[in-house]
């Protein structure tokens, strides 16, 4: 079943973590966050690093000392720091070594669903992306520093999740600097193959609200809708029996009034992970729209018992009341799963004791 090159075993570095005081994040954000959103943000942030390196995060057991402690706090002042990390975890032949403590400053305004949460304090900096903040601090816990500064300009030489600069944009993908640094410290993940979906055969609209239509365009799908409408778009990927590391999505928001808010992944009908994508074109993206090529890591890396169902939550809504078209268009180019090169007999590595 597995090709010969797929019989190279990834040596995963199991990193235990604990999370405390999530209620602080909920209570400080004026209704914008809830416990589910905080969980989604944390799982998304942890899974980002596993896309590039063989690191695997798991909750610490009841009597286990976690390697990474994450705590949501109030620091007494906003915008002074978004988070801080002390200590880090190294990869060693005997397993991960070290410890790190992360604090997330909830006195700042934070968001998960960028375009559905109110800007509570328009006269102060923010709001800030909770997924990016968590991913940044986890990067420090893995031993990664900020990008170096160019002496000539005083600016960082590269951008990335690990950038020290703070903005209120959505950033939920590793950039080249992040990938190089995590692979230098924790190794490079070995991928077996990428298995794509037959979009034309498996694409389905679920629970459309309002005027929404789905059309086949060659091997791709085109989803369009009137303003105020929404739908779930389901696609099946033939992944049965494979260990899935990440989901790959490629789509173009042809018009600015389209928002892909969440992506939910199922093993058949069993939920695997929900990811907050918050993908939307911006004012400066031009008349051709904006293309997104996303690589969404899965925290638990399931061995699929069935085909993987990938569900996109799509809204057709104007951005900030802009005088845009009365309909929006999304073109879906590709949905695929990235599988790991593990034969059946070593897949048990994904079930730590």
Predicted regions and their residues:
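Extracellular Ig-like/FN3 beta-sandwich strand-entry sites
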Residues: 305-309
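Glycan-recognition and processing domains
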Residues: 188-228, 336, 340-352
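Exposed low-complexity, polar/acidic, P/S/T/G-rich flexible segments that act as propeptides
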Residues: 311-353
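Short beta-strands within extracellular/lumenal beta-sheet-rich domains
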Residues: 220-242
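A short beta-strand element within beta-rich, extracytoplasmic domains
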Residues: 242-254
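Zinc-dependent metalloendopeptidases
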Residues: 1-190
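Short, surface-exposed beta-strand/strand-loop-strand elements in extracellular ectodomains
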Residues: 257-270
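Extracellular carbohydrate recognition and processing domains
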Residues: 272-301
């Amino acid at each position: 079943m597995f090709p010969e090159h797929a019989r190279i075993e990834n040596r995963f570095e199991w990193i235990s973590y604990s999370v405390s005081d999530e209620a602080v994040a909920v209570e400080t954000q004026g209704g914008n966050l809830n416990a589910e959103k905080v969980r989604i943000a944390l799982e998304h942030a942890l899974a980002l690093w596993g896309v590039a390196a063989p690191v695997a995060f798991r909750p610490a057991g009841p009597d286990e000392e976690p390697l990474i402690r994450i705590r949501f706090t109030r620091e007494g002042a906003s915008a002074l720091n978004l988070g801080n990390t002390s200590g880090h975890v190294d990869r060693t032949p005997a397993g991960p070594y070290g410890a790190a403590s992360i604090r997330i400053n909830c006195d700042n305004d934070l968001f998960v669903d960028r375009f559905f949460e109110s800007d509570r304090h328009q006269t102060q900096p923010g709001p800030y992306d909770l997924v990016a903040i968590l991913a940044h601090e986890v990067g420090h816990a893995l031993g990664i520093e900020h990008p170096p500064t160019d002496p000539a300009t005083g600016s960082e030489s590269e951008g990335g999740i690990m950038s020290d600069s703070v903005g209120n944009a959505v950033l939920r993908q590793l950039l080249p600097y992040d990938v190089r640094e995590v692979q230098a410290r924790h190794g490079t993940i070995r991928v077996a193959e990428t298995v794509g979906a037959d979009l034309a055969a498996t694409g389905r609209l679920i629970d459309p609200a309002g005027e929404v239509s789905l059309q086949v365009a060659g091997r791709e799908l085109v989803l369009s809708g009137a303003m105020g409408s929404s739908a779930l778009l389901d696609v099946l990927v033939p992944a049965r029996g494979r260990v899935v590391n990440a989901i790959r999505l490629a789509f173009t928001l042809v018009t600015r009034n389209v928002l892909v808010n969440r992506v939910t992944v199922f093993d058949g009908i069993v939920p695997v992970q929900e990811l907050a994508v918050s993908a939307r074109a911006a004012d400066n993206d031009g008349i051709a729209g904006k293309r997104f090529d996303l690589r969404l890591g899965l925290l638990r890396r399931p061995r699929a018992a069935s085909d993987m169902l990938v569900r996109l939550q799509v809204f057709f809504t104007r951005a900030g009341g802009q005088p845009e078209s009365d309909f929006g268009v999304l073109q879906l180019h590709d949905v695929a799963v990235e599988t790991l090169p593990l034969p059946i007999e070593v897949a048990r590595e994904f079930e730590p004791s």
